[in-house]
A protein has these predicted regions:
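Flexible, surface-exposed loop/linker segments and immediately adjacent secondary-structure boundaries
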Residues: 23, 28, 36-72, 76-77, ...
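N-terminal secretory signal peptides
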Residues: 1-13, 24-28
Length: 209
C-alpha cells in the first residue's frame, strides 16, 4: 500500500506543479512573437500603383518598400514596378502583372509564379538557378536577362542575354541571345525557336519599362 500511496502522491504533486507553473508560463508562450517574415528584396522603381499580398494581408507598395518571401506582387493599370532581389537580381513588371515569390534564397536562386502580365528578369548566374512558373510554361534560368509575358497576342519568351529553357506540354526548347518562342495557349507546346524581329523586341521591352 505504501508504494501505491507514494505513486498517487507523486501523481497529484506533478499535477499541482503543472497547473501552477504551467499557468505562469502560458502568458509568455502566447506573447512570444511569431517567426518574422523573411525579407528578400525591395522596390526600386514604381510608376502608377502596385500592391503586395501575403498571409498578413494586402499593402500598398512604394519606393524602397520591402518585399517578403511569399508575397504576391500586383501592378495596376498602366503601371510599372521594379524590384531588386538580393544584390544581383532585378525583376520588372508591366501593366496588370501578378508575380508570387514562392521560394527565394538571396543571391542563390528560387522559384516564382507569374500569373499574368509581362516580366523582365535580369540576374547573375546562380548555382541553383531560378524557375518562373506560369499557366503557359516553366522557364528555367541560370543567369540571364529575359522577357516573358503577352506579346503579339500570345505568351512569348525572349532572351536578351544568356540562355533559358522553356518547358510546356512535355516539350522544351532552349533559347539563347536574340531568340524567342511562343506558347499560344495554356497546355500548348512552345513553338520552334526563332529570332524575334526588332520591332517585336522593342514592343516587349517597352511593356516593362
Amino acid at each position: 500500500m505504501s508504494g501505491l500511496g507514494e505513486i498517487k502522491n507523486d501523481h497529484f504533486s506533478d499535477r499541482r506543479w503543472l497547473l501552477r507553473y504551467g499557468a505562469l508560463a502560458l502568458p509568455f508562450i502566447l506573447l512570444r512573437p511569431a517567426r518574422a517574415v523573411e525579407r528578400v528584396g525591395s522596390v526600386e522603381d514604381l510608376t502608377g500603383e502596385a500592391f503586395a499580398e501575403n498571409g498578413a494581408g494586402r499593402r500598398n507598395l512604394d519606393r524602397a518598400a520591402p518585399v517578403f518571401l511569399g508575397d504576391e506582387v500586383e501592378t495596376g493599370v498602366a503601371s510599372r514596378l521594379g524590384i531588386r532581389l538580393g544584390r544581383n537580381t532585378t525583376v520588372k513588371l508591366g501593366d496588370q502583372a501578378r508575380l508570387k515569390i514562392d521560394q527565394y534564397l538571396v543571391d542563390a536562386g528560387g522559384e516564382m509564379t507569374l500569373s499574368s502580365g509581362p516580366l523582365l528578369l535580369d540576374g547573375q548566374p546562380h548555382r541553383a538557378g531560378v524557375k518562373i512558373l506560369s499557366p503557359f510554361a516553366m522557364i528555367a534560368v541560370r543567369g540571364t536577362r529575359f522577357f516573358a509575358g503577352p506579346s503579339n497576342g500570345r505568351f512569348g519568351v525572349f532572351v536578351v542575354r544568356g540562355a533559358v529553357t522553356v518547358a510546356a506540354a512535355s516539350q522544351q526548347v532552349t533559347l539563347r541571345e536574340g531568340e524567342g518562342t511562343d506558347i499560344v495557349s495554356p497546355g500548348a507546346p512552345p513553338t520552334p525557336v526563332k529570332r524575334w524581329a526588332p520591332e517585336r523586341i522593342r514592343a516587349a521591352l517597352a511593356s516593362v519599362s
